[in-house]
Amino acid sequence: MTTLTRRAFAAVLLTATAFGTFGAQAAGLAELKIGFQKTSLPVIARQQGVIEKALAADGTKVTWVEFTAGPPLVEALNVGAVNVGWTGDAPPIFGQAAGSAIVYVAALPSNGQGEAIFAKPDSPIKTIADLKGKKVGVGKGTSAHNLLVAALEKAGLSLSDITPVYLSPADASAAFATDKIDAWAVWDPFFALAETRYKPTILALSSETLKANTFFLANRDFASAHPDVIEKTVEALGTAAKWATDNKDKVAQALHEVTSVPLEAQTLAANRSVFDIYPITDQIVANQQETADRFFRLGLIPKQIAIRDAVWPATTN
């Protein structure tokens, strides 16, 4: 996060406080519960202890809770099992449509190179159109799910033209290895691992298909009660992001040690990652709204939603 961006984010919080968005802040926070997946910035922030250091003077303990994908993390946010956490673009949309008490706090960039739909190199599947009638592994409600429906729509197809097989990344990896699915839609490091193992045929990249971000989310009530904790946490993430940008080789090594994914794959993933964090802009809201509208149009969510209703603080709207 650049200095300008940090100042801008702090200004948003200050303005929101001045307009009474938060009301009286809680006297203090004993524990901050962070939901994360073992990818990218969360791992680096945890390893370096930047959030712990930022909150130490307040006596706040930081607890990290691991998730395998975004949808269960969003549900944990909704019920207060965790206070803040990271997901891709699709999980908060499904959550908001289901009435989850979550808010968008900040955005993390994605250059779209670390998420793809692919098939094995010896497969007859060479384009998205070739997926018609085929089995495609994907995590339901994940960012890869969004990539899949967007890529199909772009090719004049829909989910009804394929057989989606909803699997966790670990289960999808096994299914792909044993040819129980014909193609796979997934993100790094699973995509990078598949690249190093199979040299797959890339059918679609996120960068060629849609504009997407990763998001730092919070439980709505928690964000309202503890804006100071949110600000300090985002500041700390900015510090970790700057370090990661300047030390991608060390990022790869750290992720390798934490995940046991081979260093070659983690190096590939780290080198194409963009590390930053910034406020939710009008353009980000518009991109996310486009995705939400697509999901409603395709019947993936039960009602239309307005992304702006879930952007925190309300004064950014």
Predicted regions and their residues:
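N-terminal export leaders
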Residues: 5-10
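Sec/Tat signal peptide C-region and signal peptidase I cleavage site
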Residues: 20-26
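Short, glycine-/small- and polar/acidic-enriched structural segments
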Residues: 27-158, 165-166, 182-186, 203, ...
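Short, solvent-exposed loop/beta-turn-alpha elements that line the ligand-binding surface or hinge
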Residues: 53-60, 276-284, 307
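Structured segments of extracytoplasmic/periplasmic soluble domains
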Residues: 54, 76, 80, 134, ...
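Pocket-lining segment of extracytoplasmic ligand-binding domains
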Residues: 90, 164-165, 170-257
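Secondary-structure end/capping motifs
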Residues: 224-300
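Conserved C-terminal helix/tail region of periplasmic/extracytoplasmic solute-binding proteins
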Residues: 293-317
